[in-house]
Every structure is written in C-alpha cells, then in structure tokens.
Design a protein with these regions (language model features):
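Cap/insert and terminal regions of metallo-dependent hydrolase folds
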Residues: 231, 235-321
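Active-site metal-binding loops of divalent metal-dependent hydrolases
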Residues: 51-52, 103-106, 138, 164-165, ...
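Bacterial N-terminal signal peptides that target proteins for export
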Residues: 1-9
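Short, conserved loop/helix-junction motifs that constitute active-site signature segments
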Residues: 150-156
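Bacterial N-terminal signal peptides
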Residues: 8-18
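Metallo-beta-lactamase
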Residues: 19-117, 121-125, 129-143, 163-219, 236-243, ...
C-alpha cells in the first residue's frame, strides 16, 4: 500500500513538473521567420536575407496613377492598400568572397525590421566574414545596417557605392538645396556612410566595368541620383538586383509608369524601370528585388502592355528552377 501511494505521488509530481514543459514544446509559433533562402547561380551562390517586414500604405506610397488605379491593381492581386512590405538583402558567394548587396536597417525602424545580422547568422555566417558590401543607394533601409551604434557592423568589409550617389548625399550643399522631406537622406548618409569613409573602407565607382569577376554595377538612376543595379553572371546564368526601382509587383509591373513618392526623379525612375523590365523579360534572367515579398527572387514575364512577376519555385536543394 505504501509503495502504491509513493508511486501515485511520484506520478503526480512528474505531471506537475513536465506537463507545462510538454505544453510549451507543443505550442504553435504563429510568426513566420524565414530568415534566409539559398539559390545556386552557376558557380555562385545567392542567399536572400530577410531584414523583416513592415506595413506600407501603397495607395499613399505610389503616385502618378489614375484615381483608384492603385487600389484596383492591388485588389486584382488580392492585396489590401496596406501590405506587409519585405526588406531584403542578398549575400553572394563568388570566387571565394562573401559579398553583401545592401545592409538592411539595423535599429532605424524599430523591432519589426533590423534582422539582417540575425538572418546572416542563421545562414551560417558572421558579419566579420563579409568581404564587401555593394550598396544600391543611400536610403536608410539599405544603409542603416552598416553601423551598430558608433561601431562598424561589418568590420572587415569594403563598402562600394556609385560615385554619383556618394558625391550627392555626402555634400552638405546639396542638403541645403533639398526639399525638407528629403533632408533625412543626407542625415542618414552622415550617420551611416561618413564613418565608413573616415575609416578608409568606402570605395566609389563609375559605371562601365566589373567590381569583381562576374559582378558588374549597372546604372539604374531615378529613385536616387546614382541608384545602382548589380548584375552577377556565372556559367551563362545571370541575376540582376534591381534595388528600389520596383517596389510593388502588383502595381508597377502592369503599370510601370506608376512611381513612388520617394523617387528623386520620378520621370527618370519610370524610364529606367520600363527599360529594366523589358530587358529582363526579353532575356529571361533572374532578378532580385529589395521590397517584393521575400525572398524577392523571380523572373519578369511580359503580359500585354505590362508584365507579371513569376516568383522563384521553392527548392530545398537551392536550385530554385
């Protein structure tokens, strides 16, 4: 009888101790945390890195549209006027180097964003391993992650930016002439890029040649004065990183003339977008886009007078086709 009582007490104690643990282990996680996505491109490897997502009111962000046009196009794609906008960066493994395209936001926009380092770690890499960072342009969702407070976040990386872009945003005279809403971009350059320059780690480039074997900057002006695309090519395969020349596949692919309130020169941005989309659709190469739903990799396909987005096919092996 005593043994039976002991057994029952032991079972009761075990239940009290272990049932919360079991319950915790079986509690579903309602948050999607993709973090990173691998893709092979010839001998190169591309790893999309998620900085997070943030709500964007596309009916306010997108301009040069007919009344109700943005809402209509969004509805056709089963999207509301406010969507969760991805912030993507890309790690390219090429010729023994680790090259990051854009650096995310760090703590600039709060806890929903700023996860590039976390995603990089999940993918198996550390900030100290990055050899180079290629910036598409000087907006905080692309350069914010260059600094952690007053420390350089990627201490061994050389940062590359077009000379046109750097000369414009690092010139106080240009800030003085800018409209009030654009002055924060100059402040961002001072906070995040000036320390890189002072440390001797900033390199500017002119367009017309490779930065690394198989990696070439391409002029993509309009969103900012010196906005850059980056083309990577290996064994006959190509991917073009478009930065912010395309911010909504649902709206700007069917109607490439629709622009963004953040465009420095909206007319030039629209012209650049039309040219880039036409080339990508005709040639059939991959594109990587900073704000299309993670991982932001896919193809552009012609569709009537516009285009449609064909996202990468999910692949556990990393081939993607």
């Amino acid at each position: 009888m005593k043994n039976s009582i002991k057994t029952m007490l032991s079972l009761a104690i075990a239940f009290v101790i272990y049932s919360p643990l079991a319950k915790a282990q079986n509690t579903p996680n309602s948050l999607n945390q993709p973090g990173y996505y691998h893709m092979a491109l010839g001998d190169f490897e591309v790893i999309a890195l998620s900085d997070g997502t943030t709500p964007q009111k596309l009916n306010e962000l997108l301009t040069d549209a007919k009344p109700g046009e943005v809402e209509h196009l969004l509805k056709q794609h089963y999207q509301a006027s406010t969507i969760e906008c991805s912030v993507n960066a890309y790690l390219v493994k090429a010729n023994g180097k680790l090259i990051l395209i854009d650096a995310g936001t760090s703590d600039v926009y709060g806890p929903a964003l700023g996860h590039i380092t976390e995603s990089l770690n999940k993918a198996g890499y550390k900030p100290e391993q990055i050899d180079a960072i290629l910036l598409t342009h000087i907006h905080m969702d692309h350069i914010g992650g260059l600094m952690n407070g007053d420390k350089i976040a990627f201490p061994n990386a050389t940062v590359y930016i077009s000379k046109i872009e750097a000369d414009y945003y690092l010139n106080p005279a240009n800030k003085a002439k800018a409209v009030e809403s654009a002055k924060r971009f100059f402040d961002g350059a001072e906070q995040k890029l000036r320390p890189i320059l002072i440390a001797g780690k900033l390199r500017t480039f002119d367009f017309g040649g490779e930065l690394f074997p198989g990696i070439t900057p391409v002029a993509g002006f309009g969103h900012t004065p010196g906005h850059s695309f980056y083309a990577i090519e290996s064994k006959g395969e190509k991917m073009l990183f478009l930065g912010d020349i395309l911010v909504s596949d649902a709206v700007q692919l069917p109607e490439p003339s629709i622009t963004s309130v953040y465009d420095y020169d909206a007319g030039q941005a629209a012209t650049t977008r039309k040219k880039a989309l036409a080339e990508a659709a005709t040639a059939g190469y991959w594109v990587g886009v900073s704000h299309i739903s993670f991982p932001g990799i896919g193809h552009i396909r012609a569709d009537g007078k516009g285009y449609i987005w064909v996202p990468i096919n999910y692949s556990a092996s990393g081939r993607g086709q």
